């Protein structure tokens, strides 16, 4: 190829070439593994981690497409590693996957260029980017996917280097098996496979080695790689897991899960409208610049420009990698049906850019090697090699320096504490109707994997609407009575014979237990409103029979110190699950005064009760607003409105000037901080009126 960097020419000998690649890969693995192990969280991360760990712990099936390979490897790790929490063990496994991915990126670059420095640049810049680092130390499928991306690229390079037909056939078979195995983890890698397979077949055809028997062997190898999917129907048939997803005992059920039909086969989420293709692509380029730097992007482009004039055999590999990158980016931008203007959705989408960042990092490593090689050829300066090492070291060191503090998750237990607070707040033998990924995944993990609060029963609201949920899960919820086979607002018998029930009848059948919803209640079934009310219970709500009279003093006392939460407000980035958990816990402090205030606003409430409720709401709002300097901005608005209502009540015993001053101050603070509130103009108009009223009151006092 003409590149040699610091490792000598490929022609210098296969032995030293291979040993150099192996030693370098081991060194990269050890270095990255050490950093990842040092910084990984000791407890449960956010996102899908709780659900994936629970599925592995229970030997159930994870959300579509099932991730059987990850589930089996995580289950094995949970069993074999007897130290740390269950979450820590799986976090550690994922950190090791990330380290293997780094070593494979090094191997790929070194085999293509002979440059140790280029390989270290690719492995280090990718592994220690904020995005890769963050998702390599959490119990998620992304680090294993990165491993397979690195493996497929490394095998592609080895195939291109092979000089004998037998060796090419062997590598092709290993690659086919790896392709199948990679699809047992994350399906996005199929776009890379769709580029690599035709390229391999074309090379074999060009060498006149593509025979029917070889094609059959490759097909069998690919099929063998898919064997972990046998786990799905086996687990579903045994039905021993206290948590699982779907019924894969039938071919239809298996294909529904495999093709992610409940989400949309080629979509990230169900029933979501995403940003435009151009917006997603532009965001990807900007994100890549942030994660890897503009210099890395420039080196990746340089690799393509420069290698066009070099060894055509090797350059075809580079163009293949570039084609993979372009196809993946375009397809993903088309199918990413999430609005990335929302920080949390942006956090979901950006994880899938890891797959393209890995290719860019490899191209950048090659770009550095080609740049040094070309410069050395023109200037005949041996010191350029030292500059290559210095450049690689500086890039990697800068990545570590920039991202270490944010990626050091050793003391991050926010999701764990969030779930513990919710579970600890529940009375004995309660039923919790879960809604959403955050409470659902986190509470299930603590309940099933850590054995916390075995007395409570966790029932998923969304899952109860699926036909497979209750036939699979009801047996594992012995304290809960279900009036039918599936939750549906319209009761009856479906053509399949399934009996549907609504939430009202569910509550009636479980009157012996206290029932809570966390977080929120399914809007599609309002039948519970006939005889039940929702009372605030921290982040959750309690379903209470309407005949029970609300006692504000008693409820204030019960919910005042329901959680022990000490995290500062807005401590976490808006795209993180920690931010969502923190926001929920802070807003939980406001739910009781908001509920009491809403009751006071009701026209059916007698005047004396209305005054009592307004007073309670005012005092509670004042207490939480002045408890911390930084708090949710909507508290200012709610407290100001409460002050204004108190101002109109006779005989409150509070100086009207104080109430007016407080209302003005907090309305003003709200308008400063909430620039996008559609009611902002009305609030500003109300502020002018309140200021005139305050001035009039002060004038009267002076007289």
Swiss-Prot record:
O-mannosyl-transferase that transfers mannosyl residues to the hydroxyl group of serine or threonine residues of proteins. Specifically glycosylates the IPT/TIG domain of target proteins, such as MET and MST1R/RON. TMEM260-mediated O-mannosylated residues are composed of single mannose glycans that are not elongated or modified. It is a multi-pass membrane protein. It is found in: Endoplasmic reticulum membrane. Glycans are attached at residues 403, 564. Its main location: endoplasmic reticulum. One of its GO terms (biological process) is protein maturation. This is Protein O-mannosyl-transferase TMEM260. The chain crosses the membrane at residues 20-40, 68-88, 90-110, 137-157, 182-202, 218-238, 314-334, 352-372. One of its GO terms (molecular function) is dolichyl-phosphate-mannose-protein mannosyltransferase activity. Disruption phenotype: Receptor maturation defects and abnormal epithelial morphogenesis. Keywords: Endoplasmic reticulum, Glycoprotein, Glycosyltransferase, Membrane, Transferase, Transmembrane, Transmembrane helix. Its EC number is 2.4.1.109. It catalyses: a di-trans,poly-cis-dolichyl beta-D-mannosyl phosphate + L-seryl-[protein] = 3-O-(alpha-D-mannosyl)-L-seryl-[protein] + a di-trans,poly-cis-dolichyl phosphate + H(+); a di-trans,poly-cis-dolichyl beta-D-mannosyl phosphate + L-threonyl-[protein] = 3-O-(alpha-D-mannosyl)-L-threonyl-[protein] + a di-trans,poly-cis-dolichyl phosphate + H(+). GO terms for cellular component: endoplasmic reticulum membrane. It comes from the Eukaryota. Belongs to the glycosyltransferase 117 (GT117) family. It comes from Mus musculus (Mouse).
């Amino acid at each position: 190829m003409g590149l040699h960097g610091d490792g000598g020419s490929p022609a210098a000998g296969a032995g030293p070439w291979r040993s150099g690649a192996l030693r370098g890969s081991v060194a990269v693995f050890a270095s990255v593994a050490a950093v990842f192990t040092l910084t990984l969280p000791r407890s449960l991360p956010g996102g899908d981690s709780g659900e994936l760990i629970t599925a592995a712990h229970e030997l159930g099936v994870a959300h579509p497409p099932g991730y059987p390979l990850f589930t089996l490897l995580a289950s094995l790790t949970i069993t074999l590693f007897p130290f740390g929490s269950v979450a820590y063990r799986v976090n550690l496994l994922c950190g090791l996957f990330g380290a293997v991915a780094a070593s494979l990126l090094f191997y790929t670059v070194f085999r293509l260029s002979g440059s140790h420095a280029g390989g270290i640049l690719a492995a280090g810049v990718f592994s220690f980017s904020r995005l890769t680092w963050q998702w390599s130390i959490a119990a998620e499928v992304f680090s294993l996917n990165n491993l397979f991306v690195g493996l497929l690229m490394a095998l592609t390079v080895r195939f291109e280097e092979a000089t004998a037909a037998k060796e090419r056939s062997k590598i092709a078979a290993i690659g086919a098996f790896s392709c199948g195995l990679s699809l047992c983890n994350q399906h996005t890698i199929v776009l890379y496979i769709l580029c690599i397979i035709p390229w391999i077949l074309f090379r074999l055809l060009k060498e006149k080695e593509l025979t029917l028997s070889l094609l059959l062997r490759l097909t069998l190898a690919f099929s063998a790689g898919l064997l972990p999917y046998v786990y799905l129907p086996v687990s579903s048939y045994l039905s021993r897991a206290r948590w699982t997803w779907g019924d894969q005992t039938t071919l239809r059920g298996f294909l529904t899960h495999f093709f992610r039909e409940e989400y949309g086969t080629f979509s990230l989420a169900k029933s979501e409208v995403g940003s435009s293709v151009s917006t997603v692509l532009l965001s990807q380029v900007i994100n890549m610049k942030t994660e890897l730097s503009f210099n890395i992007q420039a080196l990746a482009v340089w690799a393509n420009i420069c290698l066009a004039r070099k060894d055509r055999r090797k350059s075809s590999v580079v163009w293949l990698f570039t084609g993979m990158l372009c196809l993946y980016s375009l397809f993903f931008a088309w199918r990413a049906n999430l609005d990335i203007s929302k920080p949390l959705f942006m956090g979901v989408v950006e994880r899938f850019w890891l797959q393209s960042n890995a290719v860019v990092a490899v191209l950048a490593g090659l770009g550095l090697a080609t740049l040094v090689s070309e410069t050395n050829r023109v200037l005949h300066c041996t010191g350029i090699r030292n500059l290559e090492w210095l450049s690689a070291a500086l890039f990697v060191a800068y990545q570590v320096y920039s991202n270490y503090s944010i990626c050091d998750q050793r003391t991050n237990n926010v999701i764990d504490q969030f779930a513990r607070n919710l579970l600890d707040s529940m009375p004995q033998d309660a039923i919790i109707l879960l809604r959403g990924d955050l409470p659902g995944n986190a509470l299930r993990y603590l309940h099933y994997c850590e054995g916390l609060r075995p007395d409570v029963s966790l029932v998923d609201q969304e899952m109860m609407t699926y036909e497979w949920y209750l036939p699979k899960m009801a047996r594992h919820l012995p304290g809960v009575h279900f009036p039918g086979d599936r939750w549906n607002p319209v009761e009856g018998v479906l053509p399949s014979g399934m009996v549907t029930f609504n939430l009202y009848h569910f509550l009636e059948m479980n009157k012996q237990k206290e029932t809570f919803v966390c977080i929120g209640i399914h809007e599609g079934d309002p039948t519970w409103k006939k005889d039940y009310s929702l009372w605030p219970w921290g982040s959750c709500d309690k379903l209470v029979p309407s005949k029970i009279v609300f006692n504000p003093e008693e409820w204030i006392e019960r919910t005042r110190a329901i959680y022990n939460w000490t995290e500062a407000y807005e401590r976490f980035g808006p795209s993180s699950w920690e931010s969502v958990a923190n926001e929920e816990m802070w807003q939980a402090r406001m739910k009781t005064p908001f509920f009491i205030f809403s009751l006071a606003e009701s026209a059916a409430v007698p005047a004396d009760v209305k005054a009592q409720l307004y007073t309670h709401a005012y005092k509670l709002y004042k207490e939480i607003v002045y408890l911390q300097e930084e708090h949710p901005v909507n508290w200012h608005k709610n407290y100001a409105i409460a002050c204004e209502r108190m101002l109109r009540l006779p005989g409150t015993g509070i100086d009207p000037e104080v109430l007016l001053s407080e209302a003005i101050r907090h309305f003003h603070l709200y308008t400063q901080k909430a620039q996008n509130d559609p009611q902002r103009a009305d609030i500003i108009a109300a502020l002018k009126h309140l200021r005139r009223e305050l001035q009039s009151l002060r004038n009267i006092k002076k007289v």
